[in-house]
């Protein structure tokens, strides 16, 4: 159960990091 929750949180964090980096790259 915790493994699924961790994967879900990891994906959300990864998406936030990717979008954040992408915005910095565009500037």
Curated annotation (Swiss-Prot):
GO CC list: extracellular region
Protein's UniProt keywords contain Secreted: yes
GO molecular function per UniProt: toxin activity
Tissues expressing the protein: Expressed by the venom gland.
One Pfam family per UniProt: Cu
Keyword line: Amidation, Secreted, Toxin
Localisation: Secreted
Biological processes per GO annotation: defense response to bacterium
Keyword Secreted attributed: yes
Modified residues (Glutamine amide): 27
Superkingdom as given in the UniProt entry: Eukaryota
Cited InterPro entries: Cupiennin
Family: Belongs to the cationic peptide 04 (cupiennin) family. 08 subfamily.
Protein name listed in UniProt: Cupiennin-4b
């Amino acid at each position: 159960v915790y493994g699924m929750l961790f994967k879900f949180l990891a994906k959300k964090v990864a998406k936030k990091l990717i979008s954040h980096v992408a915005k910095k790259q565009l500037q």
